[in-house]
Amino acid sequence: MSSEFEDCIARGGVAVFPADTVYGLACDPTSREAIARLYALKGRPADKPAAVMFFTLGRALTALPELGPRTRRALEALLPGAVTLLLANPLARYPLACGHDPWTLGLRVPAPGVLSDVTLPVMQSSANRSGGADPRSLDEVDEALREGADLVVDGGTLPGTPSTVADLRAYGSHGRWEVLRTGAVSSDDIAGALAAR
């Protein structure tokens, strides 16, 4: 399934896929056309940011060599896992996924699953209409989204709680962080993981 998924993304397609939290939509984060299709399926404004997902932490760290040592240690403490990390993005990597702020990158590395062998990064967003409920199973994914996608990957029933969003933009320089959206991982768990590093 990983090869089919990679082929879909590389061709500029949009896929419904299972993350470690809820079902998502994925596309090539460097393709303006693919991103426009994904946002059109969701009914989401094109200037809203979305996370870039790597399927292993090693690939994420390789793609972002400019990360400082403190930030890299934080990523090693928190990922893979059900957190979306907002990072300072001084080189404006993946600007099409960053919305109106190319200097902030949302990063996701899910816990291992059916797509762990995928080598390409994807831009990802939950597989729902903008503002809709987060789908735990394919049956809960809107029919129009399933039909509009080029590939649908079934990962069974998922936990159903979206990722926690944590802002680490000031972590590298000042050690500061904050949770912007509470989700599958608690603030206490994040604090504990960071303190252990």
Residue ranges with predicted function:
Residues 1-197:
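Active-site-adjacent structural elements in enzyme catalytic cores
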